[in-house]
Every structure is written in structure tokens, then in C-alpha cells.
UniProtKB/Swiss-Prot annotation:
Enzyme class at the top of the EC tree: hydrolase
Gene Ontology annotations of biological process type: base-excision repair
Protein name: Putative 3-methyladenine DNA glycosylase
A Gene Ontology molecular function term of the record: alkylbase DNA N-glycosylase activity
EC number in record: 3.2.2.-
Family annotation (Gene3D superfamilies): Methylpurine-DNA glycosylase (MPG) (3.10.300.10)
Family: Belongs to the DNA glycosylase MPG family.
Keyword DNA repair among UniProt keywords: yes
Pfam family, one: Pur_DNA_glyco
Keywords: DNA damage, DNA repair, Hydrolase
InterPro entries per record: Formyl_transferase-like_C_sf, MPG, MPG_sf
Entry keyword annotation includes Ion transport: no
Biological classification of the source: Bacteria, Bacillati, Bacillota, Clostridia, Eubacteriales
Family annotation (HAMAP family): 3MGH
Annotated organism of origin: Clostridium perfringens (strain ATCC 13124 / DSM 756 / JCM 1290 / NCIMB 6125 / NCTC 8237 / Type A)
Amino acid sequence: MRLGRDFYNRDTLTVAKELLGKVLVRKINGVTLKGKIVETEAYIGAIDKASHAYGGKRTNRTETLYADPGTVYVYIIYGMYHCLNLISEEKDVAGGVLIRGIEPLEGIEEMSKLRYKKSYEELSSYEKKNFSNGPSKLCMALGIDKGENGINTISSEEIYVEDDSLIKKDFPIVEAKRIGIDYAEEARDFLWRFYIKDNKFVSKK
């Protein structure tokens, strides 16, 4: 069942935790790709110095952070890598959840072509290990870039998240510091990264 607006229109920390175990769906090139979300990070603009919208900052780049809950926010790091976020909280609040890792479930062959430009059976063990265990890696595997910024997952057929009743949900969740935000002063110590314990597609244990 597809997640609706009410799922995202809640406290960002709750959304970040409850996205774990949900299935990210991407339709591209006539193929459906699916991956179980195994790692997330929460960002809350009003109080979070790691957020692009800290202190209510609004720019052309960050405007999507203030969009309706369930909207896709894609930004670029290092001038070339993309990161996928899902907007939480009410419209104009600027909460978001970064998707940091997914476990491939369906369409793995197409994901492999998008990620490495070769079939999955041709991949080395190193390439398989690094298939989608990081925010930019999963964006490559799913063919996500700035063109997807602003998509509403509530109604879109290109990107959305669903709750698969067959997927086990009673997994232990680890709370940890977020990654790559040493500049964020006290916010760098917030335990706002969440991941499924012992899942091999988590970017960093």
C-alpha cells in the first residue's frame, strides 16, 4: 500500500524511523525498481544547523523543503552526486528525511545497468557491496537526479514509497550521529541517523 500524505505530515524524527522497512519504488525505462529503506537521517530546519533551511532560510535551492509532505527533494553534493530526501511535517515547516541506504528487492538488473553500466552477474564483490549503501549510490542505482526534485510521491507513478505487509517490521533500530556534518556545531551530535541493525546495505555502522 502506498504511503499517503498523513504518513509524512508528522514529526520528522518519527517519519525517519518509520520509513525503515518501507519500500522505495522507482519506475524508469519501463521497469519497476524497488528497494527496502534501511537507513535514514532526519533534518529539521528550524532548529538544525545541518539543515539547508536552518533558521527559516528560503532560497531557490531550498524551496522544495517547504513543500507539501511527501514531496521529493533532490540536491547535489560535491558538484556531481545526488541525494534523495522526502519532505515531512506540515507545508512551510521545512522538515526532511534523507534516504541513506536501500536493500534492492526488484529490478536489480536494471539497477546494475544504471549504477555500473553492466549486468549484475558481471559485478565484483566490491561493486555488489557498494551497490546502494549510501545516498548517492542509491540515487545512481535508481536513476534519480535533479529532474525528480519536486515530485509528489502521493500521486506520482515515477517515485513513491509503499508499505509491504510481507516485509518483517520487528527489526532493531540503531540511533546514531549523522554523517558528514561536522560543521553543524551542536547539531552534529544529534542522534538523528536511524538504520536497521546488521543490514549490509547500511552505509556506515
